[in-house]
Amino acid sequence: MIIVKVILPIPIRQYFTYLMPDFMCPIIGGRILVPFNSKDVIGIVASFYKKNNVDQANFKHIKALIDTESLYSNMVLDIISWISNNYHCPAGNLFFSILPKILHSDYIIKNKYICQWSITKKGQELNLNYFKRRKKQLYVLLILKKKHILSTELKKYNISKIILKKLEIQELCKVNLNYKISFKRKIIRTKKKLFFNKKISIVLNDVLKKQCFSSWLLTRVNLYLKVKFYLGLIQSVLYKGVQILILVPYIKNINTIAFFLEKYFNASIDVMHSKLTSSKYFSNWVRTKNGENSIVIGTGKSIFLPFLKLGLIILLEEHNLKYKSINQCRYNIRDLGILRAYKEKIPIILDSETPSLKTLNNVLHRKCFYIKLNKYNHVNQINNNIINLKTEKIKFGLSLTLINEIYKNFTGKQVLLIFNKFVLFFFVLMCQKCNEIFKCTNCDDYFEINQYRNILFCKFCLIQIKKPIFCYNCGSFSLIVFKIGAEEIKKEMHSIFPKIPFFFFLNEKNINKNILNTKSFEFAISSPCIIIVTEELVQNYYFPHVKLISLICIDNYFLSFNYRAMEYFAQFYINLNQLTRSTKKSCKIFIQTSFPNDINLKEICNNGYFSFSKKAMAIRKSFLLPPWSFQTIVYSASTNTKYNIIFLSLMRKILQKKSRKYNCFLWVLGPNNAFLSINKHKYFHQLLIQCSSRVALNNVLNESIDVINIFTISKRVKWFIDIEPN
């Protein structure tokens, strides 16, 4: 009998064992149908081995074998195994999440065959006068007497499969099936002649000359040189007859890149993203597996595609947080891209105007090479204006300076107001009798209420007062907590700008497809208006007619407990001009803040991202923060907070004991509350772990996980680990 270890689509850190008869041939990475509880479930074969004396009472038998070949390439299987070991996540969810949805069922992939029809002995000897009235059959027989007919030639000779079937029934011809080898070295031709200067040619030679892994950072390069470099690189790789993967953070980038490349190259280009239909995604997945395409442009999960022969990976906006998975398995696509390039022994290009500090640190330590195409001493001065909220009168979060500027610039222009999600939805204290809302006496904006501490506070003036007992307007004691949400924002904005048309994009679900074009991902209206959008949604679309952008409140970055917050703000702010997709004129950008004299803000606005990054790296080095150390967070979720604290406290003790074995010092903080918006009905707590060695930390975690799984408390909470958290 064959014992098979099966992965099921369940978030559990274990394999399930089943029995299979000897005459079956299981494939690692292939699907099988197995009984699980009271139903049949699709599973994936992880491993198998033969054993003669098996107690069959302890195992269930598999129901059916679905695939005859693996759905995953050897490279993808290696990457999944690496993720499971290093990110300490359940393999089941990961194996199924990277497959097309069609393959989550028992759908069988049909291999492409070429049919070959040839004439039989009976057909050769038959008198053709018999077919005088059957002219179509006679026509086919005459061709078959001369040569074989392939299924690819049916259109050429204008032959129907029905006629061939009739001849087959009469035993006048027979059909043979030959498996089609779909990948052929394609002859790639450029539609336009490309000319490169000496510098670009030297850099291209450096990138491609080694037949091994290399990581390259492309930054601080003007658009003209960048386009020339990429065209030369793609052309050189395509001539080798291999495939190229271009990874982008947002779907809006895909169509732009595909349209641009189609202008220059006569190559097969496929796109991969979540907005594709299941059938289209599956067909592109099969084409990639068979090597029928030359270039694949896709979002994060495209890194798991089973390429036949991958030759180059290009990762655009490598700093973007969209590449970080927010599910239980918290991997970073950038790290997986580097890992895949290393295993495939190919180059990877990391492209960003604002590279992450981790990547810049890798450049300093020569783990990543810097591509220098031109002398770049110039700092891109962004047309910005900082508004001090402490000295301004405020109307529902908008300063009078900004309101006046909007009225000045409104004629013939569009205004984009970018709200932070923390500013959009908050709670205030309101009188139930006269509907009066408590306001700040300094800036006249609403006081927010903190129900846990019984205080009112103004986020603009940083004033806080004790929660009042009665209404100052009417003297009533009936005070209620009222939520300010999307509807209240709309009413207030219409009262401030009564004659100006508004468009609100506060939620992905409520977006009007006629206003925001889902194909080009552009704001379709060109007439003057005010667009109100969140920081999260604004990056998913282009706003080509916008001339004035305002960041309503950025104070959350200065007050954040996350030491990376200013790095994220700098990256977001520097890349704001890309929202308009205009290279000719930059927009006016207004920043509203209560901290106009902040050192980091001044550095970013006056000297640019790289000057800020140098100082940020020096600060992190002095405090031994990443990238000079390695952090991990263990999250625990439960409906009872006690279970979380017991589990994480136990985890802390185990970690500290195991760290002595490896002679490494662990700095552990927690358990503390974690503010995650994954599940509103559960409490989240976290345990922060920091270590100077990644290998030691990984070994300690692996052993600690094995121990913690023995205790029943690990079954009462839902826990997961975030390696290198953001």
Curated annotation (Swiss-Prot):
Domain Helicase ATP-binding: 234-373
GO CC annotations, alphabetized: primosome complex
Cofactor binding, per record: Binds 2 zinc ions per subunit.
GO molecular function term, any single one: ATP binding
Key words of the record: ATP-binding, DNA replication, DNA-binding, Helicase, Hydrolase, Isomerase, Metal-binding, Nucleotide-binding, Primosome, Zinc
InterPro entries found in the cross-reference section: Helicase_ATP-bd, P-loop_NTPase, PriA, PriA_3primeBD, PriA_3primeBD_sf, PriA_C, PriA_helicase
Cofactors that this protein relies on: Zn(2+)
Residue numbers binding Zn(2+) 1: 431, 434, 471, 474
Subunit and interaction comment: Component of the replication restart primosome.
UniProt EC number: 5.6.2.4
Single GO BP term: DNA replication, synthesis of primer
Binding site for ATP: 234
Superkingdom, taxonomy of origin: Bacteria
Pfam families referenced in this protein's UniProt entry, alphabetically: PriA_3primeBD, PriA_C
Matching PANTHER family: PRIMOSOMAL PROTEIN N
Name the record gives this protein: Replication restart protein PriA
Role this protein plays: Initiates the restart of stalled replication forks, which reloads the replicative helicase on sites other than the origin of replication. Recognizes and binds to abandoned replication forks and remodels them to uncover a helicase loading site. Promotes assembly of the primosome at these replication forks.
Protein family according to the UniProt entry: Belongs to the helicase family. PriA subfamily.
Residue stretches spanning the membrane: none
Residue ranges annotated as motif DEAH box: 316-319
Catalytic activity: Couples ATP hydrolysis with the unwinding of duplex DNA by translocating in the 3'-5' direction; ATP + H2O = ADP + phosphate + H(+)
